[in-house]
A protein has these predicted regions:
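Active-site bordering "gate/hinge" segments
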Residues: 1-160, 166-177, 185, 275-285
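Acidic, glycine-rich active-site loops and adjacent beta-strand->loop/helix elements
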Residues: 40-42, 229, 253-255
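Short, solvent-exposed amphipathic alpha-helical segments in soluble enzyme
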Residues: 50-54, 123-126, 177-180, 198-199, ...
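Structured core elements
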Residues: 108, 118, 160-162, 181-183, ...
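Histidine- and/or cysteine-centered catalytic micro-motif in compact active-site loops
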Residues: 122-124, 164-167, 185, 189, ...
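Active-site lining segments that contact anionic ligands and/or coordinate catalytic metals
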Residues: 158, 177-179, 186, 218-222, ...
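Dual-mode signal for accessory low-complexity, basic/Gly-rich regions
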Residues: 175, 191-251
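Internal helix-turn-beta structural module
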Residues: 234-284
Length: 285
């Protein structure tokens, strides 16, 4: 194999990738393989499309492990163990969930901590992340282990989300000891409460100041469920959102996985012990 290793400075989500990275990937022959391992983000390409969409159009398969700067060295063994999992069993669980979500009109999530949020998902398709990327143009992040879906349009989410797992901010992920509460009306976060509310508010504001359409930043963009039985909460979103027995919600962009919202921000927030109701029926998974 002809392998090329490329390095660049640390990038935030709104920053552009270094020129030599952009040039190398744009000039890569079709149907190649790209592996991204970065402490934060790979950066933007300035093509009006996401890295994922770029890879799909060129037939590249890819693996990405982002935000590794959030992983404490003491958790490295735990992080690696999440990849030592039966992907066959995980796929079976993922396909069961996807089948239900693809047919759903609404998905409601409740938790003992107080989460009660409803997503209108009629006509939307769930995405599975199980680490199986054999087809050209496919790819995803590692460790694997989640199913997620965008809401229908901009306004199809309402309710309250009590984030008691981990939260994503501009400065990295935080393993929560006290919950963060998000109030969502007509698809948009209208109020944030909790000890760390100012950190998420700062994150939203920072991206709104840079976004072409600032109002999109606070829109609910994703509902997800973790299905990796080897994963545990460590304060790194790339792992935390995969933990079996957790759920997550994201605000910001979702156009690259079938949604309508396109913006420079995408941030996941993780909550514990979710119960999902698909068109009123409790989901067993």
């Amino acid at each position: 194999f002809d392998v090329t290793l490329l390095f660049q400075e640390v990038k935030k989500g709104f920053m552009f990738a270094d020129d030599h990275i952009i040039k190398a990937i744009q000039n890569l022959e079709k149907n190649n393989i790209i592996i991204v391992v970065v402490s934060s983000k790979i950066g933007r390409f300035g093509q009006g499309k996401s890295f994922r969409r770029f890879c799909k159009e060129r037939g590249h398969r890819f693996l990405s492990a982002t935000s590794l700067g959030d992983v404490n060295e003491t958790y490295f063994d735990i992080f690696m163990e999440t990849m030592n999992v039966s992907h066959t069993k995980m796929k079976k669980r993922a396909m069961k969930i996807k089948k239900m979500w693809d047919k759903a009109k609404t998905i409601r999530v409740k938790t003992e901590a107080g989460t009660d949020v409803t997503f209108d998902v009629e006509g939307m398709k769930a995405i599975i992340n199980i680490g199986d990327y054999h087809e050209r143009g496919s790819g995803g992040n590692m460790p694997a282990g989640e199913v997620y879906i965008p809401p229908k349009g901009y306004y199809g989410v309402h309710g309250k989300v009590v984030v008691d797992g981990s939260m994503r901010t501009e400065d990295g992920a935080i393993l929560l000891t006290k919950p963060l509460v998000l109030y969502i009306e007509k698809g948009r976060v209208v109020r944030i409460e909790g000890e760390n509310a100012h950190l998420l508010e700062k994150t939203f504001t920072k991206h709104e100041d840079r976004a072409k359409y600032p109002y999109r930043v606070r829109h609910a963009a994703e509902l997800g469920v973790g299905i990796n039985p080897s994963a545990v909460l460590i304060g790194s979103l790339i792992l935390d959102e995969k933990v079996y027995g957790t759920g997550h919600i994201a605000m910001g962009s979702n156009y690259w996985f079938g949604g309508e919202i396109k913006t420079i921000y995408h941030g996941d927030q993780v909550f514990k012990k979710p119960i999902y109701y698909v068109d009123g029926e409790r989901m067993e998974y």
